[in-house]
């Protein structure tokens, strides 16, 4: 479903824990991390789409979260032609998104990346609110920054920006799809076997992103 300008209606989700840390998911079989997001189906409201995508991508239910804010209007990004499948070029331009800021009121163990037969993520972790966005594919960085900035006014305690490094601190061990910590100590993680060790802001864009279709 595209609008007249070629943008697909979409929702994005910034999920916080009690420490104002943000959920990042590692895309299935890729070394890239992102926030949960997905298209709005015909007949859905943005809120309905948000709850559906939240469950499909994280396993969380409405009772596990509290809505604390949303963007006032659509935030748009265009997808470069080289990432668009040939059959939709000339029609599809990108995404227009309503972003929701959620507070998780459930427990970490409520997160399940295999809630559906077609999971989006195979690992997840919490990171600081203001991490460098190097891990985000370049054409999405501006919309991520806009969403984070607009929604930061809803935080209970303002999250402080940091310019310490090009990569984020890793306050929690990465979790693999079964929800358990990948390792007891960072040094013990075998990055060849556990992809979840790759952090947003590190080398998460080493692989070419998949091409975009209208189903993405």
UniProtKB/Swiss-Prot annotation:
Cofactor(s) listed in the protein's UniProt record: a divalent metal cation
Alphabetical list of Pfam families matching this protein: NUDIX
Record region (Disordered): 159-191
The UniProt record lists the keyword Membrane: no
Keywords assigned by UniProt, alphabetized: Hydrolase
First-tier enzyme category under EC: hydrolase
One function term, GO molecular function aspect: pyrophosphatase activity
CDD domains linked: NUDIX_Ap4A_hydrolase_plant_like
InterPro entries reported for this sequence: Nudix_hydrolase (IPR020476), NUDIX_hydrolase-like_dom_sf (IPR015797), NUDIX_hydrolase_CS (IPR020084), NUDIX_hydrolase_dom (IPR000086), RppH (IPR022927)
EC number: 3.6.1.-
Keyword match Ligase: no
Motif Nudix box: chain residues: 38-59
Superkingdom of origin organism: Bacteria
Nudix hydrolase domain span: 6-149
Family to which the UniProt record says this protein belongs: Belongs to the Nudix hydrolase family. RppH subfamily.
Record function comment: Accelerates the degradation of transcripts by removing pyrophosphate from the 5'-end of triphosphorylated RNA, leading to a more labile monophosphorylated state that can stimulate subsequent ribonuclease cleavage.
Protein name: RNA pyrophosphohydrolase
